[in-house]
């Protein structure tokens, strides 16, 4: 069964969301739900299909867990981890509008000389918070702190002016807690 769904795009732009299926990043669905975008969330999708889909879209939104090396996908059926977005995709992404939220995605795009809306380290789990000395949150509470960010991204994702998009997101994602403070510093425009 393929987990690729075809949707409608806004203003004649073809938008592709790459968000590998992962319960720990379900809150990220709020960024694109109801938008009618094409979505890839199948962790076993072939690299050739990913490349084909990227080539046929104008704007690429990439969400999930990752590293400076790319966006990670985990196939529960096989136990295999892989970079579903990696250095081999850089050349085709250079001609696209790119938006990403995975840990250190800004380092990936900066290394390849690409602009766009990208994140540094974003705390999305209690384990990550503890790595940065934030101990008072559990996974559920962290997911709750992220919802204003997800809703702000949902409401601004179609904006052309990325600086204005970032300004509005930071204005709306402004809770008085350590996770929010940490994450706000890592919402970047390249």
Show which residues each predicted segment covers.
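A short, glycine/acidic-enriched catalytic loop
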Residues: 67-94
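Short, well-ordered coil/turn elements that cap or connect secondary structure elements
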Residues: 34, 93-95, 111
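Short, glycine/charged-enriched secondary-structure capping and boundary segments
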Residues: 30-32, 74-77, 113-115
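Active-site-proximal C-terminal subdomain of hydrolase catalytic domains
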Residues: 97-190
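Short acidic, S/G/P-rich loop/turn micro-motifs used as interaction or catalytic elements
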Residues: 21-25, 45-47, 65-72, 104-108, ...
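Short, T/G/N/S-enriched strand-turn elements that build extracellular solenoid repeat scaffolds
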Residues: 48-53, 71-72, 87-91, 110-111
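A domain-level signal for caspase-like cysteine endopeptidase catalytic cores
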Residues: 2-63, 99-101
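Active-site-adjacent structural elements in enzyme catalytic domains
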Residues: 10-11, 93, 105
